[in-house]
Structures are given as C-alpha cells and as structure tokens.
Regions:
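Flexible nucleotide-interacting loop at or near the entrance of a catalytic core
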Residues: 246
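N-terminal secretion-targeting helices of virulence/extracellular proteins
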Residues: 1-243
C-alpha cells in the first residue's frame, strides 16, 4: 500500500476550482434558457412543424436535465474533494499536538439547481401571406407556420451552449485534476472515476447540443425555401399587398 502523502491546502484549492467549474456550467445553462425564452412556437403548428416541435420539446427537456445533472455532479465532486481536504487537515492537526495553525474550515455547500423546461417549439409563429387562399387548393400543401428566424436563434444558442459547456468542464477541471492526482490518498482512484464520468456526461451533452442545433438550422432552411417559392408564385398572380387576384 502506497504511503499517505497529502497537502490538505492544495487539495482544498483543487476542490474549490472544481466547484467553480461546476458553477460555470450553471451559467451556461442560464444563458441558454434566456436565449430560448424568446423562441416559443418556433416550429409552427402545421403537421410537419408540430411533428418536429414535439420531438424537439422532448429532446430539449432531457438535454437540459442532463446539463443540470452534470453541473450538480461536478459541484458535488468538488465539495467531496474539499471535505477530504478538511478531514486530512484535522487528522494532521491531531497528529501534531502543539503545532501551530488549525484545521481547514468546512466548505460551504453550493445549492443544486433544477432543470427548467424550455418553451415548447409548437405554436403558430407565421401567418399565411395575402393571396394564399387563391393558390392553396391547387398546390395541395400547407403554409409552414414556423419562424425560421427563431429557429436560427435557438440553433445558435444550443450550439454555443454545447461549445461553452465542453470548454468549461475540460478547462475548469484540468488543473485541479492534476493537483488531486499529485496527492497519494486512498480515494484518489474513486475521484478519478468521478472525473471520467463527468467528462463522458459533458461529451454527450456537447454532441446532443450540436445535433439539436443542426436539426433546427435544417428546418429553418426548409421553411425559408418553401416560403420563398410560395411568395414567388403569389407575386406572379396576386397583388402582394392585398392578395387580390390579378386578371
């Protein structure tokens, strides 16, 4: 068995850095939520839009839950490391009776955050243009009621959140991981496994954020293409302002 070699102060500092990294992930979630707040109903309520919207709603809610769980887990890991540091400092103080200094204080516990459900993507965001009633019966299609601008805003928000979440976890835990691994303590392997779990969770979050962003961007492009084609057709047969059929 390897001898116990630990610097409680260094271990406590590393744990505090991990907590800070976790809290940073919370800020990423808050920024994402604020951006998505203005994107309600972005997919529309036509059949295609509603189908995509319901799928998005489910995926987005689960992904935010995963992000929150990763944030809370990382903060909890950091507090666990800090508690270990305190325990070692107490043991060190007790084994050196008469030595100066004192034990490290118990760390303050960061409160867990909860997952707020993103606003639904289903809803009417764009009404049909003047003159649509003239051509709709002949085209056999429905005017897409989604809002491509909102879809692109949401896509950008998800993409940015994924990138920032990944960078925040990797950069924020790199240095403290090195400091923790420098300590020869029994719980070292368990802490390593916890960091590996956090990394896997973060990687999954990043990938899913990019997938959602790509899905929203693709649907925005489809809406814009259909809208442009319909508006072009209407401009040929109707007054674009009144929608009255030209004869």
């Amino acid at each position: 068995m390897a001898p116990l070699t630990v610097d409680p102060t260094a271990l406590d500092s590393a744990g505090n850095q991990v907590v800070t990294a976790g809290e940073g992930l919370g800020s990423v979630i808050s920024t994402l939520s604020a951006a998505l707040a203005g994107c309600a109903g972005m997919a529309g309520d036509d059949p295609a839009g509603a189908s995509l919207g319901h799928s998005y709603d489910s995926s987005a809610a689960k992904l935010v839950e995963a992000m929150v769980a990763t944030r809370n887990g990382l903060c909890g890991l950091g507090i666990g490391v800090r508690m270990s540091a305190r325990n070692y400092s107490v043991a060190e103080l007790q084994s050196n009776v008469g030595a100066g200094g004192g034990a490290l204080p118990a760390p303050a516990l960061p409160g867990p955050i909860s997952a707020g459900r993103p606003p639904s993507a289903v809803g009417s965001s764009d009404s049909a243009p003047p003159g649509w009633g003239w051509v709709a019966p002949y085209l056999g299609m429905i005017w897409p009621t989604g809002d491509s601008a909102k879809l692109r805003v949401a896509a950008t928000a998800w993409s940015a959140a994924g990138t920032q979440f990944g960078i925040g976890e990797i950069v924020g835990t790199g240095t403290p991981m090195g400091a923790i691994r420098a300590q020869q303590i029994p719980e070292g392997p368990a802490i390593d496994r916890a960091f590996a779990d956090a990394y896997r969770s973060t990687t999954g979050v990043v990938q899913q954020c990019q997938q959602i962003a790509a899905q929203l961007t693709s649907y925005a492009a489809k809406i814009e293409k259909v809208h442009a084609a319909i508006l072009d057709l209407l401009s040929r047969i109707c007054d674009p302002l009144t929608g009255f059929k030209e004869v």
